[in-house]
């Protein structure tokens, strides 16, 4: 929390997203990033609609403007609990839009890179799994597949690692617009 507070201070006057306020540190991060320096606060919860909503409520009760909150409702790489993460995202979007729940109407950002590059398909070396092909290409594939799927499922933004993944997803978004 202290590092995030210092980061918010360092980018004072700029439009920055400070990741991540969690249940255990939302007061410090929310106060520094959202209140003192008027930054956007990333609210990170486990893959659970109720926890996401609760954190948004806590941040807004602290005084952070709801328009300055971006939710991270959790993620998983494609094939690794991904369906549960997507169903949570679907429920968040349904409650926000269909039911008009203002506490869930914040944009969603999904940190794809940390999930996609941490699975065995991306981590196994070519020496260990030669039949799987090039390790870097596998990581890129996992990142692109997961990013495309979460964007289709309601995420408003993704965090990617590899330049090829960024280019591929950027192209996909431009072609869909």
Predicted regions and their residues:
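Catalytic alpha/beta core domains of metabolic enzymes, predominantly
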Residues: 24-165, 169
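Short acidic, glycine/proline-enriched helix-loop-strand junctions
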Residues: 169, 173-177
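N-terminal active-site wall of soluble small-molecule enzyme domains
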Residues: 1-12
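Active-site catalytic pocket residues across diverse enzymes, especially alpha/beta-hydrolases
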Residues: 11, 96, 173
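Short, well-ordered coil loops that connect the C-terminus of an alpha-helix to the N-terminus
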Residues: 13-14, 65
